[in-house]
Amino acid sequence: MSGGKKKSSFQITSVTTDYEGPGSPGASDPPTPQPPTGPPPRLPNGEPSPDPGGKGTPRNGSPPPGAPSSRFRVVKLPHGLGEPYRRGRWTCVDVYERDLEPHSFGGLLEGIRGASGGAGGRSLDSRLELASLGLGAPTPPSGLSQGPTSWLRPPPTSPGPQARSFTGGLGQLVVPSKAKAEKPPLSASSPQQRPPEPETGESAGTSRAATPLPSLRVEAEAGGSGARTPPLSRRKAVDMRLRMELGAPEEMGQVPPLDSRPSSPALYFTHDASLVHKSPDPFGAVAAQKFSLAHSMLAISGHLDSDDDSGSGSLVGIDNKIEQAMDLVKSHLMFAVREEVEVLKEQIRELAERNAALEQENGLLRALASPEQLAQLPSSGVPRLGPPAPNGPSV
């Protein structure tokens, strides 16, 4: 890519993962792809990619949304960084991955990566990605520098209509469980939330969001009955419960806040499910299941109604066409039957006239026949219809 004359590129075709657990020392190193011999790759904006060299590995290497992304595929290294080592002109780092990312988070992660581009250090989107996956931030080895800890600090706003908009677009944070339960991410950000303020500290593995809300209660059902609820109904149930508690806190006075301290009720999202406080509320898992069941039934009925509304026009059109076809066939059959009846009536009339003529002729012949001729009639099989005439011509 130097001088616009020579272009070289590489592509990682496969990455094998061999991971046994978050703290198992027996995890084997996955095979690292062989580096190419060409010049180092450049980012789509023209800047050369930085060499780690034993320092903080860049986490945000994704191209901006408008740049072409057909030559390179940027893969984030959220956790499990090993010791960097040199291989030729490249500095390589072994990565251990856990397959905890559901397929439904692909678009969310891509949107987070696209919204926060650049080549900085451990920024907000990587921390939010870790929090959305339910993973704690990794503890880097001694060879790597410890990055800043990302905090989400909301402004001290008064609780009111602004607190109703509980779902925002800044960060996707969930309370993780110890089991591999695929739960939908719970958005926790205020509309007037300020950008995060990075702080350096020794604890690089903490990412939490403190959102003060009046009498807010969210239960972290790690391994209970909430894991058996569908994701859509759970999300609707949680949203409805949050709106009910935020909208009318005076009506539900029996519900205690999340924290035992009434002065600072806050909702903390941490990377460990054991640190989450579960309030002993009367509306527990049973109420959550009832709300989720009601919302799922309403959603199913709404989908059925929309399907009926969308397909009612086509069904009515098909019924009309069938009725028109049946009417056409009926009219054709009626015309054919009428024509056949007229033809049969004509034939019956002709046969009746002929029969009358034959009977008249037969009577005349019998009147004119002789007794000898009439005596021969039974032998010929012709019945005698009348008395024989005394004199008459022979037949």
UniProtKB/Swiss-Prot annotation:
Keyword terms, alphabetized: Cell projection, Cytoplasm, Nucleus, Phosphoprotein, Repressor, Synapse, Transcription, Transcription regulation
Gene Ontology biological process terms from the UniProt entry: glucose homeostasis; negative regulation of DNA-templated transcription; negative regulation of transcription by RNA polymerase II; neuron cellular homeostasis; neuron projection extension; response to osmotic stress
Subcellular locations according to the entry: Nucleus; Cytoplasm; Cell projection, Dendrite; Synapse
Ranges for region Leucine-zipper: 344-365
Biased composition, class Pro residues, residue ranges: 28-51, 385-395
InterPro entries: TSC22/Bun, TSC22/BUN_CS, TSC22D4
Residues modified to Phosphoserine: 49, 62, 165, 187, 189-190, 225, 260, 264, 279, 370
Modified residues (Phosphothreonine): 57, 211, 229
Family matches, as Gene3D superfamilies: Single helix bin
Region feature (Disordered): 1-86, 103-237, 376-395
Entry comment describing in which tissues the protein is expressed: Expressed in the liver.
Quaternary assembly: Forms a homodimer or heterodimer. Forms a heterodimer with TSC22D1 isoforms 1 and 2. Interacts with NRBP1.
Function field: Binds DNA and acts as a transcriptional repressor. Involved in the regulation of systematic glucose homeostasis and insulin sensitivity, via transcriptional repression of downstream insulin signaling targets such as OBP2A/LCN13. Acts as a negative regulator of lipogenic gene expression in hepatocytes and thereby mediates the control of very low-density lipoprotein release. May play a role in neurite elongation and survival.
Family the UniProt entry places it in: Belongs to the TSC-22/Dip/Bun family.
Protein's name in the database: TSC22 domain family protein 4
Lineage: Eukaryota, Metazoa, Chordata, Craniata, Vertebrata
